[in-house]
Amino acid sequence: MRRNDGERHCVQWSRGARKFFGKNPEIIDIPDLIEVQKASYDQFLMMNTAPEDRPNEGLQAAFKSVFPIKAFSGAAMLEFVSYEFDPPKFDVDDCLRRDLTYAVPLKIILRLIVFDVDEFTGAKSIKDIKEQSIYMGDVPLMTKDG
């Protein structure tokens, strides 16, 4: 007696072809379930958007909600200017081989404004302005497979 395993056919998906041994053929394509998460994370980071073109959402909104930071005395203020990502230190394959997180360095550009405050009138005048790029840490990235 011969066993009937049904028809074999291949189903294509993001990681390649997969053999299907079911009796009924696939009616719809297998959805890329991670696509929503990848698109959302890309929208949060806005890596491919120029700093001056970024809308006030995602990581940009997070930084804007914290800054400016003002000194209690009113003599200084720290403003958020923008953020940028450096290229990843290692590519995806190197990270897999070395058991590392695939990530990019995040730097923010801050502006320090120092005021000269008049003791009698309380009037402020700008004494000094400095801008500096500051390393904030590594931000994990999602690969094409999630």
Swiss-Prot record:
One of its GO terms (cellular component) is DNA-directed RNA polymerase complex. SUPFAM superfamilies: beta and beta-prime subunits of DNA dependent RNA-polymerase. GO terms for molecular function: DNA binding; DNA-directed RNA polymerase activity. It is an enzyme of class 2 (transferase). InterPro entries: RNA_pol_bsu_protrusion. It catalyses: RNA(n) + a ribonucleoside 5'-triphosphate = RNA(n+1) + diphosphate. It holds the Pfam family RNA_pol_Rpb2_1. It comes from the Bacteria. GO terms for biological process: DNA-templated transcription. Its EC number is 2.7.7.6. Keywords: DNA-directed RNA polymerase, Nucleotidyltransferase, Transcription, Transferase. The RNAP catalytic core consists of 2 alpha, 1 beta, 1 beta' and 1 omega subunit. When a sigma factor is associated with the core the holoenzyme is formed, which can initiate transcription. Belongs to the RNA polymerase beta chain family. DNA-dependent RNA polymerase catalyzes the transcription of DNA into RNA using the four ribonucleoside triphosphates as substrates. This is DNA-directed RNA polymerase subunit beta. It comes from Liberibacter africanus.
